[in-house]
């Protein structure tokens, strides 16, 4: 049982995303630790990429800044190695496929050695993912797969068969970014998905406040907040303020 599975046995998942290298690797380490201190219990560490088609403007701009500072996939793994000296909470590497492809087959074992627990490749459909899935499982890294509102039952069966750790439900079409409410069809979609899988389901793409997080947890096993944190980091939020922000968004934390 890996750290992701252990976490879901303890409590619902509060997942935070940040783009590694935005503001420098030291700043990223500081931010990861601040988020963990604020109650985040799973971290998604984003590998900056030059064509992040699934991401909205906030995360696209973070990728541009991180790449401008020379951040590479190996730098991201060094960051995770440093984080592992301080914390054992699960880490999911959030990436596009090209950086993995460019790094070669050894990258999966390097990911495992750095302390990565799961890998989510945002632009790799399950139908084309066989080599990636095999490499993940050989390295004992959970392949985290995506579901969307348009995922068919047949495709969901395939995703359920190959995914591990958890499934990530993208609760609305389009790119990442802050939204005001969850989609109206969210409860029905979640119930449909849950009837077809025993894996925990987290949901994201737009959750931006405590109320939305609480609503998500009525149906999902966890929620993801990304753009809000990325924007705050870009604006120079202090590590203590980032911890307080994370606490303020957590439905299980006492009201701020």
From Swiss-Prot:
Keywords: Amino-acid biosynthesis, Aromatic amino acid biosynthesis, Lyase, Tryptophan biosynthesis. It is an enzyme of class 4 (lyase). The alpha subunit is responsible for the aldol cleavage of indoleglycerol phosphate to indole and glyceraldehyde 3-phosphate. InterPro entries: Aldolase_TIM, RibuloseP-bd_barrel, Trp_synthase_alpha_AS, Trp_synthase_suA. Pfam families: Trp_syntA (PF00290). GO terms for molecular function: tryptophan synthase activity. The active site is at 44 (proton acceptor), 55 (proton acceptor). Pathway: Amino-acid biosynthesis; L-tryptophan biosynthesis; L-tryptophan from chorismate: step 5/5. Belongs to the TrpA family. This is Tryptophan synthase alpha chain. One of its GO terms (cellular component) is cytosol. Its EC number is 4.2.1.20. Signal peptide: none annotated. Tetramer of two alpha and two beta chains. It catalyses: (1S,2R)-1-C-(indol-3-yl)glycerol 3-phosphate + L-serine = D-glyceraldehyde 3-phosphate + L-tryptophan + H2O. It comes from Coxiella burnetii (strain CbuK_Q154).
